[in-house]
Design a protein with these regions (language model features):
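Positively charged
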Residues: 1-150
Length: 150
C-alpha cells in the first residue's frame, strides 16, 4: 500500500497573498507530478470539510488547483476564469481550510468558463463551463492562486 502524501494546510495570510507562478512544462514535469500527488491526497484527507484546494495552500507557489465536481474532482493547471457577466453574481457564505472557523460572505459569478490544461498525458488546453457550486469553488481556488484572500 502506498503512503498517503498529505501536506499541512497553510494558514499564514502573508504566504497566501503571494500570487502563484504558472506551470511551464506540462509533460514529464516531476514538480507538477509531486504537486498533483500531494494536492490529491491532502484533498482526500480533508474532503469532509473541503470542496477544493489550491497548490499554494499546501506550500507550492504554482498555478494548480483541484475542484470538486459532481463526478469527483478535476485538476486544473494554469486555470483562467472567464465570468458570464449576463448571468450576474450572487453573494453566499464560504469557508476555507486556510482560515479554520471563519465564514466569509463573498459575491461571485453564477456561471463561469474556465480555460485550463488538464493533468493528463495529453494536456491539451480545455474549456469548460461551470454553474452553481462548481463555479463558486473554481473562483475561490483561482482567488488563492492570485493571492486574493476573502
Amino acid at each position: 500500500m502506498m503512503k498517503e502524501l498529505i501536506k499541512e494546510i497553510i494558514t499564514d495570510p502573508m504566504k497566501l497573498k503571494i500570487p502563484c507562478r504558472p506551470i511551464g512544462k506540462l509533460q514529464n514535469n516531476a514538480l507538477l507530478d509531486e504537486i498533483v500527488m500531494y494536492l490529491t491526497d491532502t484533498y482526500k484527507a480533508n474532503q469532509k470539510r473541503c470542496l477544493g484546494l489550491a497548490a499554494n495552500q499546501i506550500g507550492y507557489q504554482k498555478r494548480v488547483i483541484l475542484v470538486r465536481i459532481t463526478q469527483g474532482f478535476v485538476i486544473m493547471i494554469n486555470p483562467v476564469i472567464v465570468p458570464s457577466l449576463i448571468h450576474g453574481r450572487i453573494t453566499k457564505k464560504e469557508n476555507c481550510l486556510s482560515f479554520p472557523g471563519q465564514v466569509f460572505r463573498v459575491k461571485r459569478y453564477k456561471r463561469i468558463k474556465v480555460i485550463y490544461h488538464p493533468y493528463t498525458k495529453e494536456p491539451v488546453l480545455q474549456t469548460h463551463k461551470y454553474t452553481g457550486l462548481a463555479a463558486r469553488i473554481g473562483q475561490h481556488e483561482v482567488d488563492h492562486l492570485n493571492g486574493v484572500l476573502r
